[in-house]
Amino acid sequence: MTEEKRKAYEQATAALDAYLKAQSQKYQDPARHCSLDFTCPLPSVGRISTYFGEPDAVYNKPHTGADMPAASGTLIYAVAEGVVSAASARPSYGNCVQIDHGTADAGSSYATLYAHMSSFCVSAGQTVHKGDVIGYVGNTGDVRGANGGYHLHLELRINGTRTDPLQYIPH
């Protein structure tokens, strides 16, 4: 990868993180409780194509989530109750949705991000329940190399920090 592409990737990632943080702050409610009783975001997961922390084939950076291959248009479900804090198209993540799930008993806040959707069917500020359809599997945004093809890119952020979603979310 050229230095120019690396810088562009890092700038896009920083812009996305700033956007998601600002959106979370708009919709965070300290009174919202997160039970940590998550469900699978897809009807079924046959395999994980890229795990959290694995080197990205294109940018050679640690992968920020878990990639779950699925057929185009497969339903994507909210893994838990929460409020949609972002639903938009982003250059690298394509059509994506972030849901703020609230604060767990230990005081940590939880949010999930669903990326590369063909489309989403929720909007910022909307309350969703565990298992609600929030969108459909796609390949929008920057989906090349081993991460290409139709898949759900799922991230879990605890207190704003990316964390391995497979440690918390059934798959």
Task: Label each residue range with its predicted role.
Residues 1-35:
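Alpha-helical oligomerization segments with coiled-coil/rod-like character
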Residues 29-30, 47-81, 100-101, 158:
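Short glycine/threonine/proline-enriched tight-turn/helix- or strand-capping micro-motif at secondary-structure
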Residues 50, 70, 86, 116-119, ...:
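A residue-level detector for short acidic-glycine micro-motifs
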Residues 61-63, 78-121, 145-152:
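Zn2+-dependent peptidoglycan hydrolase active-site motif and core
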Residues 75-84, 122-137:
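Short, well-structured beta-strand-loop connectors
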Residues 95-98, 126-171:
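Conserved, short, structured surface segments that act as functional micro-motifs
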